[in-house]
């Protein structure tokens, strides 16, 4: 038996783990006290990761769809040769607009992204669709306007805040904050601190709160606007901070002062006394921060919500300070900056949608495939994603994917999307390869965890860097690795820390500019084989995939040399980044990469004047338009995608991992159930404009009347059986989304629920 250090892959926290491995199986999973961020924390979901690693639907070898619709086993050589031929032919006949990529690695599979994006370059395409773009792109767009770059990302210093305002999030189940349950417990126990939760359901986090504002679903924008109006009208805004660091407050102030405060509070259906208490406490606190999540990012007014929640900490000056909201450093670039005003980014053919942070929204993908125009999407690569179940309107995805000329899926399991593919390519799991995540969101101390492989892969499963490098070679895009670079990488003494190779590699790309887009694979084939960490166990699987991290470490050290040195790394202007890279490579528990000081947070602002630009005309218009928005209250509103104790993302396919709620019950207020003749455990039919689902009812008096909830992470077929629980996106509509970012309104889906016996038969 061996004990291996790795990390959880279920949410963006990526907590460190120690896993006992015996005979190729996980025998015990516990938190890793040596992890620089999580420090031993473990939740119940991570403790069941053996069900991800060992389940029966693992892909064993490449598959090709036959004319009869079945799959046949093929070799890697045949699969990649045929794919190379098809991709070249598609590019030559239809150009780059005919090709798109969907994926990005989920919550912990990000290292392959440097390699998969090269395929887009080879295909002359920029169309990247990602789950992030059905969750967070409205937030990224707001960041670009406020701070000057869509990559400027905000975190929250909850551990040191006197007042914590959580809006549309349930960290007790969803995590998203450091060591969530410990942090919530500490907040609750401290009488000098105040926890406020805004949520239409009395969640586990809301039960721990000092104040729970149980808003009517979809009215968060009205509540946040009311809080801001109160702060301004009572002159609680931080004039000193606004004068020193912001511009455009005058236009915002004018809008807030004329806002119909009482009407907005009534629209949210909360008590004015509670709103006043929260506004005053937040504004007057020594330190305060805001934490938000999908509850407002996938609800009505999504992009406006992202603007208003940031205004709460900006207007009060709780930004760039201990216990406030702050920027953070980053190593792995998972986002881009694609401001549509620059005029250089490609809109989609049908919706004329521009990318946000380099990403296009999944909500429009079926339409872009079915578009009758010549430049519609004809071929799609799906990597580590299952959009058939996770994208809005499953029926639309199934219909659109059936019309593709080429659908290729790279995954560890035979997903619902893979079942529709022309080729299915087996990837190694996240514990069978070198891997990492780009969700390094901490401030002032930030860390990066390069996870070492702790198990050998299945015989024909390959890591994504190898898959995409081989494909580029088969397409003729990537020449054989230059012998001189390979020799230099092998010969260069360790004391020069690869700097000679870096200089030679840069010179090679300068002379061969066509190959610059393929730098990751070139480093993989040249420097990669020479990366041999001292840790013997990891040496059995090549660390070549980590080679591009050298360039990223050098860049970070150039941008933030003092922060890198404070994190414990030693070196001069030339060697500091190489020293950081070596630490990343050698430390299986993860390593600190930067240690900032709070007053440095403002340095991340990218506007030329170094100020926060509060006036965003498009969003001020949306804010003003709330006054005239008609109040429409559906019979029932479905919250699609509730976080529960035993649901996670799509990588948990084996239903045996769940200790409770095996059917993914529909939660409903007892009075709503009684009005429909339903009791706990009854079967019912939940119907929306797009479809119907049979569900099991569970009574929950923590819900507001008029709302029901279903969990995400269900509906997968296991070992060829029926769907395990609800396929919730049979109920969601692609057009029911934010008008700016096209993020879906999953948390506000109008539905009807009826006792199954009284329902019309399903078609």
Model-predicted segments: where are they?
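Acidic/polar loop patches that form or flank catalytic/metal-binding clefts of enzymes
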Residues: 27, 238-239, 275, 289-290, ...
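N-terminal export/assembly segments and adjacent metallocofactor-ligating motifs
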Residues: 1-234, 258, 263, 271-272, ...
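Catalytic, metal-anchored helix/loop core of enzyme active sites in primary metabolism
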Residues: 422
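Short beta-alpha connecting loops at secondary-structure transitions
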Residues: 207-215, 432-437, 446-457
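Long, contiguous, secondary-structure-rich segments that constitute the structural scaffold
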Residues: 464-517, 521-522, 654-667, 671-763
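Extended redox/cofactor-interaction regions of prokaryotic respiratory oxidoreductases
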Residues: 114-188, 193-196, 221-225, 310-419, ...
């Amino acid at each position: 038996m061996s004990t291996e250090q790795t990390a959880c892959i279920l949410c963006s926290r990526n907590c460190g783990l120690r896993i006992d491995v015996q005979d190729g199986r996980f025998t015990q999973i516990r938190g890793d006290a040596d992890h620089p961020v999580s420090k031993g924390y473990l939740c119940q979901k991570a403790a069941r990761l053996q069900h991800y690693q060992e389940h029966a639907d693992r892909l064993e070898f490449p598959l090709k769809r036959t004319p009869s619709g079945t799959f046949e086993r093929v070799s890697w050589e045949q699969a990649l040769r045929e794919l190379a031929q098809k991709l070249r032919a598609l590019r030559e006949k239809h150009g780059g607009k005919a090709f798109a990529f969907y994926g990005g690695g989920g919550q912990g599979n990000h290292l392959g992204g440097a390699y998969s994006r090269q395929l887009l370059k080879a295909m002359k395409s920029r169309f990247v669709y990602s789950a992030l773009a059905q969750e967070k792109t409205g937030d990224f767009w707001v960041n670009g306007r406020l701070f000057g770059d869509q990559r400027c990302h905000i975190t929250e210093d909850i551990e040191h805040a006197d007042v914590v305002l959580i809006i549309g999030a349930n960290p007790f189940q969803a995590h998203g904050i450091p060591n969530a349950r410990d942090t919530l417990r500490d907040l609750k126990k401290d009488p000098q601190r105040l926890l406020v939760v805004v949520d239409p359901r009395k969640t586990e986090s809301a039960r721990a709160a000092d104040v729970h504002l149980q808003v009517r679903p979809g009215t968060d924008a009205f509540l946040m606007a009311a809080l801001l109006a109160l702060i301004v009208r009572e002159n609680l805004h931080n004039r000193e901070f606004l004068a020193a660091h912001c511009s455009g407050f005058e236009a915002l102030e004018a809008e807030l002062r004329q806002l119909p405060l009482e009407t907005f509070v009534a629209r949210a259906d909360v008590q004015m006394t509670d709103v006043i208490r929260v506004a005053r406490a937040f504004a007057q606190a020594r330190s305060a921060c805001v934490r938000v999540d999908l509850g407002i990012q996938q609800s009505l007014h999504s992009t406006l919500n992202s603007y208003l929640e940031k205004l709460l900490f900006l207007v009060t000056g709780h930004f760039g300070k201990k216990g406030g909201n702050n920027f953070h450093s980053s190593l792995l670039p998972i986002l881009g900056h694609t401001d549509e005003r620059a005029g250089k980014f490609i809109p989609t053919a049908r919706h004329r949608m521009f990318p946000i942070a380099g990403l296009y929204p999944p909500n429009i993908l079926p339409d872009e495939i079915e578009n009758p125009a010549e430049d519609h999407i004809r071929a799609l690569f799906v990597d580590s994603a299952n959009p058939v179940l996770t994208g809005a309107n499953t029926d639309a995805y199934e219909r659109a994917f059936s019309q593709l000329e080429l659908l290729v899926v790279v995954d560890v399991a035979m997903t619902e999307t893979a079942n529709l593919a022309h080729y299915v390519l087996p990837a190694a799991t996240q514990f069978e390869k070198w891997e990492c995540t780009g969700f390094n969101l901490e401030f002032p101390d930030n860390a990066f965890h390069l996870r070492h492989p702790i198990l050998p892969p299945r015989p024909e499963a390959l890591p994504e860097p190898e898959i995409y490098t081989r494909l580029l070679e088969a397409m003729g895009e990537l020449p054989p690795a230059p012998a001189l670079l390979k020799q230099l990488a092998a010969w260069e003494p360790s004391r020069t820390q690869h700097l000679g190779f870096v200089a030679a590699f840069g010179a090679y790309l300068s002379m061969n500019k066509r190959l610059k887009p393929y730098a990751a694979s070139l480093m993989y084939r040249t420097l990669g084989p020479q990366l041999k960490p001292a840790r013997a166990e990891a040496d059995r699987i090549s660390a070549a995939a980590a080679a591009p991290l050298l360039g990223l470490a050098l860049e970070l050290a150039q941008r933030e040399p003092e922060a890198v040195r404070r994190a414990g790394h030693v070196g001069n202007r030339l060697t500091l980044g190489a020293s950081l890279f070596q630490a990343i490579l050698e430390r299986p528990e993860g390593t600190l990469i930067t240690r900032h000081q709070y007053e440095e947070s403002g340095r991340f602002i990218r506007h030329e004047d170094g100020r926060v630009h509060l006036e965003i005309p498009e969003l001020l218009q949306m804010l003003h338009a709330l006054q005239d928005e008609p109040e429409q209250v559906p019979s029932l509103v479905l919250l699609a995608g509730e976080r529960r104790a035993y649901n996670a993302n799509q990588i948990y396919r084996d239903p045996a991992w769940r200790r409770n709620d095996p059917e993914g019950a529909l939660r409903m207020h007892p009075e709503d159930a009684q009005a429909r003749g339903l009791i706990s455990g009854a079967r019912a039919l939940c119907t929306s404009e797009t479809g119907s689902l049979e569900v099991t009812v569970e009574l929950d008096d923590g819900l507001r009347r008029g709302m029901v909830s279903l969990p995400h992470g269900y509906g997968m077929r296991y070992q060829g059986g029926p769907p395990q629980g609800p396929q919730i996106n049979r109920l969601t509509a692609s057009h029911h989304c934010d008008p700016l970012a096209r993020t879906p309104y999953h948390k506000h889906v109008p539905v009807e629920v009826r006792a199954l016996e009284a329902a019309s038969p399903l078609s």
